[in-house]
């Protein structure tokens, strides 16, 4: 069966190469205004090199990796695809269609300009397989500066979570919600791995979310601190938190109902769309006292097994994405942060500059679990912590016991 699939894919690739060697089919799931504007930065760069960009855009939240592999095995694969999951690259390798990029990045001298978390995220089984295009920190705190002033608090001065929680009474006394939280499973899941990095540090985080999780950390002091901290956050959730979308939650902070939100820093797109300015209307900090921050890296892959002409065009795409100026322009359009530490900063807002400052410390960053860990294990953690979040009577011991049981079932 594998031989017949591979034969069909190879034949399709040969036909497409003969028809138009520099027409690249680009597969992605970006469709919002800022996302399309950012894509156009890449498209302009690719077309400046003499190539053609043909779009395959699918809706968000449709299982994009499944659809991608359906195209590949169906004999109509894209040349370039937006995909971070390491499993997809392993599947392509099994079909003989992976395209390692280690040699390209090494020859271009690009890797030295990426934060360590980016290099880790784009590496699959020892090879550079992805082209990083944007960075988001999963656990940034965005706060309304007017609300902070009215409440008499300064989030930028918080040096610990205890200091943050201690100021919340001042915020309540001033008539505001201290912390806006969207009570959906994925939002709680993202908060958990952000807190795992912040309270447990890189070693604990890697043991829990690495490629080979270490069961000894499941019942550790760090895990107990993580769950106890999560309970404190749950107790701060307002009455309307349950099942609230993240962007609706962000709007509560933008409109001055709440002081702050801790979430992925794609929140910034909502602030920008509302005409707000970083450093003037809103501030951004990492989780107070954080020992590390988890980093999401939006990345592209390219397909192997193609003609020299198409392969060269794909590498031109990689060069465009990796260009420092393109990185800055892309980030400015999308509301993200460049993956290169040497990207020009004059077009970046205050929050992107702060993210790059944080990422200068190689020991202070860890990759998003979706880029490293077994998907079943990650999903099982989400199930347990969301049950813990939703049921205030569930104890830390109960949660740990469930996580241990899941480990034995999935990885034991």
Q: Where are the predicted features?
A:
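Long, aromatic- and glycine/proline-rich binding clefts that accommodate carbohydrate-like moieties
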Residues: 282-285, 331-383, 387
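Conserved C-terminal helix/tail region of periplasmic/extracytoplasmic solute-binding proteins
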Residues: 45-48, 73, 149, 363-412
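Conserved N-terminal structural module of periplasmic/extracytoplasmic solute-binding proteins
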Residues: 8, 19-90, 94-95, 242, ...
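Glycine-centered hinge/linker elements that transmit conformational signals in sensory
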Residues: 166-168, 210-242
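Extracytoplasmic/periplasmic solute-binding protein
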Residues: 128-133, 165-212, 258
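Extracytoplasmic/periplasmic substrate-binding proteins
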Residues: 29, 194-197, 228-310
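Extracytoplasmic/periplasmic substrate-recognition and gating elements
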Residues: 22, 44, 48-49, 149, ...
């Amino acid at each position: 069966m594998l031989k017949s699939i591979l034969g069909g894919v190879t034949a399709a690739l040969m036909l497409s190469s003969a028809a138009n060697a520099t027409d690249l089919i680009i597969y992605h799931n970006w469709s919002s205004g800022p996302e399309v504007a950012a894509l156009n930065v890449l498209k302009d760069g690719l077309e400046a090199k003499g190539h053609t960009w043909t779009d395959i855009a699918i809706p968000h939240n449709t299982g994009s990796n499944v659809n991608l592999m359906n195209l590949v095995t169906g004999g109509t694969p894209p040349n370039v695809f937006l995909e971070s999951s390491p499993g997809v690259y392993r599947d392509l390798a099994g079909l003989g269609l992976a395209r390692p990029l280690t040699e390209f990045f090494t020859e271009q001298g690009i890797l030295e300009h990426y934060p360590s978390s980016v290099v880790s995220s784009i590496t699959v089984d020892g090879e550079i397989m992805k082209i990083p295009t944007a960075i988001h920190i999963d656990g940034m705190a965005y706060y309304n500066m007017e609300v902070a002033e009215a409440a008499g608090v300064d989030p930028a001065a918080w040096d610990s979570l205890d200091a943050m929680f201690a100021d919340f009474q001042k915020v309540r006394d001033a008539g505001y919600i201290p912390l806006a939280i969207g009570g959906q499973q994925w939002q709680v899941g993202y908060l958990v791995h952000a807190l795992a990095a912040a309270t447990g540090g890189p070693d604990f985080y890697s043991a829990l979310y690495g490629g080979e999780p270490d069961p000894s950390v499941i019942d550790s002091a760090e895990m107990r601190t993580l769950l106890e901290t999560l309970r404190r956050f749950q107790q701060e959730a307002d009455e309307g938190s349950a099942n609230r979308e993240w962007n609706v939650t962000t709007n509560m902070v933008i409109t001055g109902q709440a002081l702050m939100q801790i979430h992925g820093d794609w929140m910034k797109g909502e602030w920008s769309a509302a005409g707000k300015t970083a450093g003037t209307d809103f501030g951004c900090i990492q989780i107070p006292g954080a020992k590390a921050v988890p980093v999401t890296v939006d990345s592209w892959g390219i397909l192997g097994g193609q003609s020299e002409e198409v392969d060269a065009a794909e590498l031109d795409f990689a060069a465009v994405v990796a260009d420092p100026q393109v990185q800055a322009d892309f980030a400015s359009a999308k509301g993200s942060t460049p993956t290169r530490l040497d990207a020009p900063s004059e077009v970046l807002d205050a929050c992107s500059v702060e993210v790059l400052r944080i990422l200068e410390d190689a020991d202070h960053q860890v990759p998003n679990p979706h880029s490293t860990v077994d998907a079943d294990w990650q999903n099982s953690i989400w199930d347990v912590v969301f049950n813990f979040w939703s049921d205030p009577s569930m104890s830390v011991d109960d949660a740990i016991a469930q996580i241990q049981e899941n480990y034995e079932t999935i990885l034991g």
